[in-house]
Amino acid sequence: VSVLLRNIGTLVTGDVARPLRRADSLFVANGRIEAIGDGLDRAADVVIDARGTTVMPGLVDSHSHPTFGDYTPAQDALGWITHYCHGGVTTLISAGELHLPGLPIPPDARTALALAYLAKRCWENLRPCGVKVRAGTLLLVPGLAEADFDGLAAAGIRLVKFIFYDYARLPEGEAERYVAWARARGIKVKLHSGGVSRSGVSQVAGAAIVERLRPDVVGHVSGGPIPMPEKDVEAVVAGTDCALEVCSSGNPRMVLTLMRAVRAHGAHARVLVGTDTPGGTGVLPRGMLREIAYLAGVAEVPPAVAVAMATGNVGRAHGLAEGVLEEGRPADLVVLDRIPGSVAADALDAFARGDLPGISAVLIDGELRVEGRSQQTPPPERPAVIERRRG
């Protein structure tokens, strides 16, 4: 299927180094962006008239907790992934499938490996509403061998996570070996930071743990739900090069502390946005949009940069092609505009004012998944007009 998207008012790239691009049209073929420019006029199966509104990459949720299927036992909710798609989310990155009913917490090594393999294989075969669920994240526990990391890499698992590992065992050196084994195989390492989570058995981790283990991603550094102390957050920004995750489940005040440190150190490219849902915070279809609006409207992040934190920064930190609108990338994108009654001029101005915009279309791999209007946002002021070629 080919798609021509024309009359774009503002193109937000998702690239934090170049967050806006001057172009009014975009052509998609075979699920990827083939061309971006001005006045593109190519025959297409689907023509989308953006009517001068904003186009941005599909949102990449850096921190989600799927189990199996479009259902979460954490809130006994059906269809949550489909609802997130209507909130502009096109990729979900699993921070562990730890809400599986009956899962021993913490799991032993054999159980943790089995769960990661099973989740990886199941989510390779299922995409609710077309959403890409990057699952099979291994929960790191004592007792793993280097050969286990060979198996993870062979299965295509690309993320492991410290959350239940007993840090009293750090002097043994096993945790550092896990990081080295993962890195040698192209597997990213995430670390649950801050206080204890809903499970009651996650391990507390502040700056000292982060500085020792040096994960690729510091999970919910602003709290999930409780953050590390302010001085620790500042130390992690200043003293490491780890990616810094901001989640909807966390402490809003700590986001302001984090962003002050990020500005001081020019670290905007390290900030990632996630929801840390489903969980005790609930199911949040608009969670990613709300976090962008908070960063732009309260933390004074330029809105196109805040979008990059929820798209391209996340993709880059996790080694994914998704999150940036440029030639050759997956055609995952969102068309959106201000909501009727908003004082904003457009979607980016809405974010800058702390408002939510309204979504009129979502494409994943070039296929329309939401059209007309989202089920999860108010309608946009100027909905996109979609025409399909007959025959």
Tell me the role of every PLM-derived stretch:
Residues 62-75, 131-145:
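Active-site mouth loops of central-metabolism enzymes
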Residues 330-384:
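C-terminal cap of metal-dependent C-N hydrolases
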Residues 73-81, 141-152, 200-209:
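Short, acidic/polar
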Residues 80-111, 120-141, 154-167, 186-190, ...:
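Divalent metal-dependent hydrolysis catalytic cores, especially in the metallo-beta-lactamase
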Residues 260-339:
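His/Asp/Glu-enriched, well-ordered alpha-helical/loop segment
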Residues 157-263, 267-282, 299:
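Active-site core of metal-dependent hydrolases
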Residues 42, 50-114:
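Metal-associated gating/positioning segment near the N- to mid-region
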Residues 1-42:
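N-terminal metal-binding scaffold of metallo-dependent hydrolase/deaminase domains
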